[in-house]
Amino acid sequence: MWGYIHLISWVAIVVLTVTALLIYSKSVKSFTMLQMINRVFYILVILSGIMMVKYSIEQSWILAIFKILMGIIVIGVVEMLLSYRKQQKPTGMFLMIFVIVVVITISLGFYLSGGYPLFN
């Protein structure tokens, strides 16, 4: 169950982040709402990640710690990306970092879980 919550929350974070970036020029109020909803999903990701960490550590404790750090970095990059967008600063660098870090984090997550919940 925690795997599904974790996966759905990560998908929601990615979708909300991309939507917020695209919608900013049209509505700052909607952008702020999406940013706040994103933060609720951070809490879900952190809680579900804590519940699943014991299974990841059994697989490989070094990769589990690295995945935890990558997850924290993803949340930080999303916050920086959205705050730079709100301040109308260039976001290209953070967008590239976001894509790279998300791909690495997702790959590690599926490796450590043996493909669960998507490939079981």
Curated annotation (Swiss-Prot):
Q: Where in the cell is it found?
A: Cell membrane
Example GO CC term: the record gives:
plasma membrane
Pfam families assigned: DUF1516
Topology versus the membrane, per the UniProt entry? Answer: Multi-pass membrane protein
Q: Which UniProt keywords apply?
A: Cell membrane, Membrane, Transmembrane, Transmembrane helix
Q: Which residues form the signal peptide?
A: none
| Keyword Iron-sulfur found | no
**Superkingdom, taxonomy of origin:** Bacteria
Mark the transmembrane ranges.
Answer: 3-23, 33-53, 62-82, 92-112
Which family does the UniProt entry place this protein in? Answer: Belongs to the UPF0344 family.
Under the heading NCBIfam families, the entry gives: PRK13673.1-4 (NF010197)
Protein name per UniProt = UPF0344 protein LMHCC_0278
Organism in which the protein naturally occurs: Listeria monocytogenes serotype 4a (strain HCC23)
